Amino acid sequence: AHELADKPDKLSMLLSYPGQLLPSFAKLIRNPKLIDAVSQILGPDLMVWGSGLFVKEAKTESYVTWHQDLTYWGLDDAEEVTAWFALSNSSVASGCMRFVPGSQKKRLVPHQDTFADDNLLSRGQEIAVEVDDSEAVNVILQPGQASLHHGHLFHASGPNTTEDRRIGAAIRYIKP
């Protein structure tokens, strides 16, 4: 990504479409262990809806508000699982993801667009109902570890206060 720092269009394409541009990422999408884990949830017939790389630069205030992915993908009630891989340490200090366990059972809730400058979501979208932060769990991952979550699950992440980037990769699987 350093080589692309002065080429924002190319960097944007890489972050948004790693499965189409990076052979190693395309191989990860088809990893038998990953497919087995996702198949246990969705069944054997899977399709990749999309993928992306998420970079939180070191010592930045960037964050992600509480949200549900399916509210802005146009898939409302899809049977979907996101596999989120840590490509670097994902700790509380580096802004790891936070989940509210069981919140996916609430289905879709109202969201609002804030367009907040430091929010990493495209429109600064956030859940417009109260989220009990005390129920949240931190998803701390080492490089190479992954978490799975449904697009209805309430999730967020804080800023990266460490000296290193926090980098993650997401692969979104759906039933065709």
Indicate where each model-derived feature is located.
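Aromatic-acidic/polar surface patches that form glycan- and anion
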Residues: 23-30, 76, 133-142, 162
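Short, surface-exposed loop/helix-turn segments at secondary-structure junctions
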Residues: 9-12, 68, 121-133, 163-165
